[in-house]
Amino acid sequence: MFDGHFVRISLLIRKSKQGATNIYKQIGWRDRTGLSALVTEKTEKSSGPLWIGPLCDSDIASRLTEEKAEQICGLNLKEMPTDWDQQRLNLVLREIRRSVRHIADAAPLLSQNHLLIPMDVFAKKSGRGGPPSIKKSIAILQSNGFEAARGPYPEPTLITNADESSVMHLLNQIQVNQN
């Protein structure tokens, strides 16, 4: 979960040879020349090693809504420090909601193999001007049978189970229609 420039994570540690082998299969490198090109070994144009497997448990993450986060983490007027006013409380509650926004919607995709595409990276890789609207990008992918959601990251990020060539083709259609 993003909190400013920090990322909070929760881990469950298990000892197992088979588990270690399964974990090792989820480690890879990302080829910087494509949106998602994963490679099995380090190359001159790759970053890594990186975790390339699912990012969360869908059942748990799908329950992490803005309302639930505010209920669990939020303060009320009685719990506030005495020097706080309603405006400061509202700011804290807004930040709590922002920190989990889009997690529940993206949970099914984050719990499986997926592409995670920052929209500004798409714009750069496609060779066009700016990126298309993330809402239009999600809509066109879903209308073509793919799953898609906005990622729970500060920058507009698309998460999908579509392959890279389908993403490039479909999102470039939006770009052409916007010009």
Locations of regions flagged by a protein language model:
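SAM-dependent transferase fold signal centered on methyltransferase-like domains
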Residues: 1-179
